[in-house]
């Protein structure tokens, strides 16, 4: 989340690759379960300063990581909650109509600040909910991401997170730009001859070069 806030993600890949290697050294069959929030910690929205672009940047990074990313309910909407455990477990916001929500835990001392629920965000193509949907669909194009071995790449810019993931002889590269203002290009020898599987945020790929608008990413399969 620090990388998402700062718009600097170049060290994320190397740190995650090192972590995955440490896991496999202990248990070769294990897979990581990346997350940014769960029921025992303050919700990601508060830590990301309640700004949707920051939330999108964090999701862009962790939902394309190797392993089995875990989304805590309501995170994909931007639900808030911190302090006592009950505040972190407030009812799902299905719509702006309070009648659609369950009762809050009895000991909760915070009210849910989010007003736009599933119903409202569902019809907004730029909503956080639809961003999560697009990222999950993108991830599903690369089965290598579940159990593959991760290797960090140097994307040439602090805002670029780049790495490869290899499983069963097949390798994909993930390249993401967490800058919220700069369009960046990435040209690496390893990308020559690669095939674009899919992208998000207007990312484009041609002749071994990734063109990445602010908050965008892609997956390519290497030859």
Where are these regions (language model features)?
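Aromatic- and acid-rich polysaccharide-binding/catalytic face
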Residues: 1-6, 32-42
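C-terminal beta-strand-rich structural cap/linker in extracellular carbohydrate-active enzymes
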Residues: 206-223
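Residues immediately flanking
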Residues: 38, 77, 177-178, 222
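A residue-level signal for conserved active-site and pocket-lining positions in enzyme catalytic cores
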Residues: 39, 135, 215
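Loop/helix patches that line or flank the sugar-binding groove of alpha-linked glycan CAZymes
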Residues: 14-18, 29, 43-172, 178-183
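Short, conserved catalytic or adaptor-binding loops enriched in Gly and charged residues
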Residues: 23-27, 153-154, 189
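Glycan-processing catalytic domains of CAZymes
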Residues: 1-27
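Beta-strand-rich binding/interaction modules
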Residues: 182-201
